[in-house]
């Protein structure tokens, strides 16, 4: 079995979350689907989930999607041994349409360890770097540009809606005051310090950093993550053959609620998990970032069973 961690010359090192949990329902698919079938990894990252499934199912083919050039380079290196069974596409999943239906479509919605741990990507409040946060560093507005553009009330609403941050108005007021008085923040550490200062002293020493929710909100906004997820959940069932499997790993309640609702209400799908699967204690001990992961599965119904055919 391949190791799901990535250690490559690209510097992309990542431990895939819930890899075994994803592999089990894939293994339960009928052999006729897996024989020469296509798998679409909509968030390829370093290729850990895909490598595991390609290893276990030698007749499976892969199309891997990712907008992050660093991730694509790492995945290409990691998956090279699978040869022409693998195709990597530089795209956001919302802009993709497959030429043929797939037997498996999966998406891991989390920010990868390399994105969090490389300061220059600007995702981390623990490592000082530019206030960027773009998944695709060549496209779109940075977090610094976003907080500079928004009015205080707009920024507060964004932090509350996307970060579920109860101190959103206090934080937005502090950010806009700092920008007006001092100019742009020097980097992520300065913003994290400002956000932490909005909390009472005792609340700054908890397990969760005070800036966590604000940084989550800015990252979601910069990358339009929730709208992209909604569009993916609308499109993905049509990428599947009847009986095909849709697997989504989410990392916060805003994502999980959308996945749960889509799997429950979409008449093209049969929900396979009433409650999401979560990481085992052993996995959490080995990879603490798996603590918040939730995995849900659905099966594509035969066309005759969908509402359109009734």
Curated annotation (Swiss-Prot):
Catalysed reaction(s) here are: cytidine(1402) in 16S rRNA + S-adenosyl-L-methionine = N(4)-methylcytidine(1402) in 16S rRNA + S-adenosyl-L-homocysteine + H(+)
Which domain of life does the protein's organism represent?
Bacteria
Keyword Ribosomal protein annotated: no
Q: Gene Ontology cellular component?
A: cytoplasm
Where is this protein found?
Cytoplasm
Quote the InterPro entries the UniProt record gives.
RsmH (IPR002903), SAM-dep_MeTrfase_MraW_recog (IPR023397), SAM-dependent_MTases_sf (IPR029063)
Q: What is this protein called?
A: Ribosomal RNA small subunit methyltransferase H
Write down the species. Prochlorococcus marinus (strain MIT 9303)
